[in-house]
From Swiss-Prot:
Stored InterPro entries: P-loop_NTPase (IPR027417), Thymidylate_kin-like_dom (IPR039430), Thymidylate_kin_CS (IPR018095), Thymidylate_kinase (IPR018094)
Keyword Kinase attributed: yes
Protein name, as recorded: Thymidylate kinase
Source species, domain of life: Viruses
GO terms for biological process, alphabetical: dTDP biosynthetic process; dTTP biosynthetic process; dUDP biosynthetic process
Species of origin: Cowpox virus (strain Brighton Red)
Pfam families for the chain: Thymidylate_kin
Keyword Protein biosynthesis found: no
């Protein structure tokens, strides 16, 4: 039995990640494809993260980074098991979000990546570019919904993309929605059909 693919959607806030994940779940109906999003706010760490994001509580940046990281590690075994059982996972945000946001706040990218080192490695990361309209929508109730901060996050994403150690697929914001939806579906299908070998370890 071939293993499943780990396919991650990344991008700035309000770039359409969840929408595109749901499009995939609807357009490729299968009992071998599941959706997972981070942070998982139902866990102990997830509830602490939710309190922070919604400004109910404050923590120093180091604690925040570790909370997000721990939230992903809580699901590392689940992800590994699902992939080995032939289940493809469509993941809305992953370690790259954690590193980009931490680095945008001034943390060391190398140190931030070390916290995530060893997580299941994605077979594909789809990065959704944000047009000016999407970026300017980044004003909201949650703590990171700030235009200037999101621009800093974007620069950190670009650094990771340029490293070239992960298979990134950048989707332009210029595409019409129906074109974007079809393009992403085809990219995902190809990734599912071409996945080979054991599950890798991220940043090892």
């Amino acid at each position: 039995m071939s293993r499943g693919a780990l396919i991650v959607f990344e991008g700035l806030d309000k770039s359409g990640k969840t929408t595109q994940c749901m499009n995939i779940m609807e357009s490729i109906p299968s009992n071998t494809i599941k959706y997972l999003n981070f942070p998982q706010r139902s866990t102990v760490t997830g509830k602490m993260i939710d309190d922070y994001l919604t400004r109910k509580k404050t923590y120093n940046d180091h604690i925040v980074n570790l909370l997000f990281c721990a939230n992903r590690w809580e699901f590392a075994s689940f992800i590994q098991e699902q992939l080995e059982q032939g289940i493809t996972l469509i993941v809305d945000r992953y370690a790259f979000s954690g590193v980009a946001y931490a680095a945008a706040k001034g943390a060391s990218m190398t140190l931030s990546k070390s916290y995530e080192s060893g997580l299941p490695k994605p077979d594909l990361v789809i990065f959704l570019e944000s047009g000016s309209k999407e970026i300017n929508r980044n004003v909201g109730e949650e703590i990171y919904e700030d235009v200037a901060f999101q621009q800093k996050v974007l620069q950190e994403y670009k650094k990771m993309i340029e490293e070239g150690d992960i298979h990134w697929q950048i989707i332009s914001s210029e595409f019409e929605e129906d074109v974007k939806k079809e393009l992403i579906k085809n990219i995902v299908i190809e990734a599912i059909h071409t996945v080979t070998g054991p599950v890798g370890q991220l940043w090892m």
